[in-house]
Amino acid sequence: MRKKIIWFGVLWLTALSLSRAQTETPTKKKEIQITWLGHAAFELVSSGGTDILIDPFLTKNPGTPAELKDLSHYHPNFILVTHSHGDHLGDAVELAKMSKAKIVSVYMPEPFKKGELPRELIEPANVGDHLTLGDVKVHVVPAMHSSEPSGRPVGFVVEFADGRSVYHEGDTWIFGDMALIQEFYHPNIILMPVGAAADGQSPRMAWIAVTRYFKPQVVIPMHYGALPGSSTEADLRAVFGNDPRVVFMKPGETKKF
């Protein structure tokens, strides 16, 4: 009798386990939409519709297609700025005033005051901060660069609802703490500056960073081809070879991942 009870219990637990396995479904990957707007400017749109502009250097960007220089084209929920150099801050202040989207950045009093940006449109951030913006989380990480006239350079890891993340490096050179960014956030997609010639992160240094510190599924080169003296796509292909993780985008092109 005791053996029958035990076997009945085993069968019941097995049936319960199978029933749960059939009803529980794994988290499905959701679409991440990425548009390269030229240089370091990107638009990310989550599956929930959160629209984020990063480093929106547009109207004076020679790499931005003419039809995308019109700021009325954009309706961001948030604007992320990695530092105050003109080719990254770009049109952020004007876009914030037009769209009422908050600028998320290390506080930069000079450009913000000059643009007469209302305080409620500024979301000060610092290295180590974790911000919930719509249905995404944004982690603020270090960058190795300068930030005249004020502030400090940072990068952003944008984490989506399905757990995947996009790392916009900003403008940086390779640095050892990239290992911590990989350890903490495991970026799946890296938007990597590769266009420096005399200074900054060259294609070779960028590739060393990818192979030494990161394990991405996708690497999208940026910060090249627009400004005088920057690397060309041919320069990049000579270094990156035929690595299938590298996705070359054209300014204005949109891809879904």
List the model feature ranges, each with a label:
Residues 26-32, 46-52, 130-139, 159-165, ...:
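Beta-strand-turn-beta hairpins that frame and shape the catalytic cleft
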Residues 60-62, 86-90, 110-113, 129-132, ...:
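Active-site environment of divalent metal-dependent phosphoester hydrolases
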Residues 116-131, 208-257:
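Binuclear metal-ion centers of metallo-dependent hydrolases, dominated by the metallo-beta-lactamase
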Residues 37, 46-85, 90-94, 146-148, ...:
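Pre-active-site segment of Zn-dependent metallo-hydrolases
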Residues 67-131, 136-139:
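Active-site HxH/HxHxD metal-binding segment of metal-dependent hydrolases
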Residues 54-56, 76-84, 103-107, 166-170, ...:
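Active-site neighborhood of phospho(di)ester-bond hydrolases with catalytic His/Asp-centered motifs
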Residues 2-4, 11-51, 58, 242, ...:
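Zn-dependent metallo-beta-lactamase
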Residues 144-213:
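Active-site-proximal loop/helix segments of hydrolase catalytic cores
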